[in-house]
Amino acid sequence: VPKKIAVTYEDAHKVEPYNEALRMVGLEPVPIRAEDSVSLAGVDGLLLTGGPDVDPQLYGQEPLPETQKPDPPRDRMEFRLLGEALERNLPVLAICRGLQLFNVYHGGTLIQHLPGDPHRTKQRPPDPSQPLHEIRVTPDTKLAAILSDGQHAVNSRHHQAVDRLGNHIQVSAKSVKDGIIEGLERPDKAFAVAVQWHPEDQVRTDETQLKLFRAFAKAVNGGSR
């Protein structure tokens, strides 16, 4: 029986690539929206997905004009589920907005807008699987054990980024060109890994990105917990 993964989302169309990536590694996605008000009872891991900007009030700031309208119910749900997952030592994979929420949950702050949008593709129509820039993975991190350290090409579509780092977490990757944080993790947890790019869009074209989901599946199946 495949292990179940709670997948947070608000747009059924956008959640499908995450679900597909999980199925590729033998996991069963259980999509959850804010209005579902569920706990993690009966699931074996948590996937925090992309979406709108985290409410700046959660890190003590007023929104800038470029900041998207917040979705407080989703912020509250994901804070609650992340807290529950960390407390129970369930594997957590956080992607894009998920990484930003992971940092804010731990007391960190965000850069509300990267001027000039250096981390968003200018292509129209954009191909989400196309790499946009290089990251450098920090040696001796969980991410390095999964992807190997050194440089990797990743896709990118975010206009916010980690500013002040939260507590109990470490940086596992940075953008080569401008030093923007691209990976975070909790070293004291069996698997609590966050990435700023969208590996779910690259799993069919880049074996390296599939490794991230394979490692998540291994942790969920008891391999590194």
Predicted regions and their residues:
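N-terminal beta1-alpha1 cap of cysteine-dependent amidohydrolase-like domains
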Residues: 1-93, 103-105, 111, 115-147, ...
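Conserved G/P- and acidic residue-centered "switch" motifs that form tight phosphate/ATP-binding loops
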Residues: 96
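The feature captures the ABC ATPase H-loop/switch
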Residues: 99
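Catalytic histidine neighborhood in serine/cysteine hydrolases
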Residues: 189-193
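Generic enzyme active-site microenvironment
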Residues: 196
